[in-house]
Amino acid sequence: KIAFILLCHKDPDGVIRQALSLAEGGDCVAVHFDGRAPDESYARIREGLSGVAGVTFAARRVRCGWGEWSLVEATLEAVKAARTAFPDATHFYMISGDCMAIKSAEYAHALLEREDADHIESFDFFESGWIKTGIREERLIYRHHFNERTRKALFYASLNVQRRLGLRRKVPAGLRIM
């Protein structure tokens, strides 16, 4: 049984449709709706999914910021809710509220039955070209105390101070950064 971990921040009606389509095949869904999103939108989702078997909600709505630890925290809240509500789940499948699955749940089940493996999407940090804009190696070798999006001046001032003082960290030997 797959427990879909649905992280979303907008479009309540789209979230409802997505959760219903994931749950109707017998799987389950744990929803985390961003704490920064309007309470009215969250209430709409709760109402729209009320009484639907196989749907649960994270106990706490985390205020999320792109690229921040808060996204990990929100994920963990949803996984905790899924583990509590659906103890028979054998796999956890994280999906964004902005994305609709391009493969069916049946496809995912067949793949999981066929292969005794966990599947985690990852990209080689240095070789993949996954990072399209902004800093690259600096993401690893310097410490980042400020959010680039919300405190841009402090972010770059901190980065420049570290560069001038030579406060580089080494990437641990033998690790392939994904």
Model-derived segments and their meaning:
Residues K1-M178:
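ER/Golgi luminal nucleotide-sugar-dependent glycosyltransferases, focusing on the catalytic module
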